[in-house]
Design a protein with these regions (language model features):
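Short, conserved beta-strand element in jelly-roll/cupin
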Residues: 140, 147-165, 213-216, 221, ...
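Non-heme Fe(II)/2-oxoglutarate
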Residues: 1-2, 6-31, 73, 79, ...
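Double-stranded beta-helix
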Residues: 163-229, 251, 271
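A structural signal for short, well-ordered beta-strand segments and their strand-loop junctions
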Residues: 52-54, 121-124, 155, 169-172, ...
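Non-heme Fe(II)-dependent double-stranded beta-helix
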Residues: 1-48, 54-139, 144-148, 185, ...
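A generic structural micro-feature
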Residues: 148-152, 204, 236-238
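Residues that flank catalytic or metal-binding motifs in active/ligand-binding sites
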Residues: 94, 123, 152, 156, ...
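Short, solvent-exposed loop/turn segments at secondary-structure junctions
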Residues: 57-59, 93, 127-130, 144, ...
Length: 292
């Protein structure tokens, strides 16, 4: 019953009022400082199709990100409501602070290294906010949503606060080959049947689920074949995340994009089905100093 009342878990504000906020120049430097992965990171991602990496971003940079996203949300949506899932796309084209986080070479290099590709382009950014009481995110994999003719697609999920289980962090099915287990289930977003079939299959097959909290500064990367979900936000605080999706340079748009792919022409303007996805809105994010 969706009207059933749940106890709201009260959390303190995500960031202390005493926190010293770094300058914009310091943030830019942090977001362009390379993060070197270890072999264990590559092995884990290769096996499981996702990875959570701690301490990628500082508490100061996340405080700035959260503040900026809150301003954007307040401009677009009425505030002080409950239960809603709010999203905003392509904010990097309008907001210079969000732009630094979306085009960050520190983050894009990690994504490229995990995919083991040399050049990576941006598909889009997506601000995702769950208000207090907002329900769970159904099981899905991103391959249905991006009309790209490549397996080299990856999304980084940057929570703009520490995200305990009660707040609804991203959760992942593992290893990545559970994709084969459910690939014949027809995707649909018109009802809950797809989500229920996936969940039932995973339960029957005793699939492992990584559903732990995200510490402050911890971010995740997941392949477009990775099945993931997120829980309900049972806290009194807004759960905010910035999700950026990247793909290998040279990838083409599939020949017959469907409605599931959404408004893909907004993200790859001027490119026809079968064409190379390299519009002005798909800059190369890694390596840096490469002409698009």
């Amino acid at each position: 019953n969706s009207n059933k009342k749940h106890k709201v878990i009260k959390l303190d504000l995500p960031f202390s009022k005493d926190l010293v906020i770094p300058s914009f120049d310091k943030i830019k430097k942090e977001l362009s400082t390379p993060y070197e992965l270890k072999e264990k990171h590559l092995d884990y991602f290769n096996k499981n199709g996702f990875i959570k990496i701690p301490n990628v971003l500082s508490i100061g940079s996340l405080a700035i990100l959260r503040k900026e996203i809150l301003l954007l949300l307040k401009k677009k949506f009425s505030v002080n409501k409950r239960n809603r899932f709010l999203s905003m796309e392509m904010m990097w084209t309008e907001n210079k602070i969000i732009r630094e986080y979306v085009l960050s070479s520190r983050i894009a290099k990690i994504a490229a290294d995990l995919l083991k590709v040399k050049r990576l382009r941006l598909y889009h950014d997506n601000i995702l906010a769950k208000e207090s009481g907002c329900g769970r995110t159904p099981w899905h994999c991103d391959d249905d949503h991006f009309p790209l003719d490549t397996k080299d697609v990856i999304t980084v999920w940057i929570p703009a606060q520490a995200t305990p289980r009660e707040m609804g962090p991203l959760s992942f099915a593992m290893p990545i080959n559970v994709y084969d287990m459910v690939s014949k289930i027809n995707f649909n977003n018109s009802d809950t049947s797809y989500d229920k079939k996936i969940g039932k299959t995973f339960k029957q097959q005793k699939v492992l689920i990584e559903n732990g909290p995200f510490e402050i500064g911890e971010i995740s990367f997941h392949h477009n074949f990775s099945f993931h979900t997120a829980g309900k936000n049972n806290t009194n605080q807004l759960r905010i995340a910035l999700a950026n999706t990247f793909f290998v340079d040279g990838a083409k748009v599939i020949s017959n994009p469907t409605m599931v792919s959404g408004d893909w022409k907004k993200f790859i303007p001027g490119v026809r089905p079968g064409g190379i996805a390299a519009s002005k809105l798909n800059p190369i994010c890694w390596p840096i100093n490469i002409k698009n």
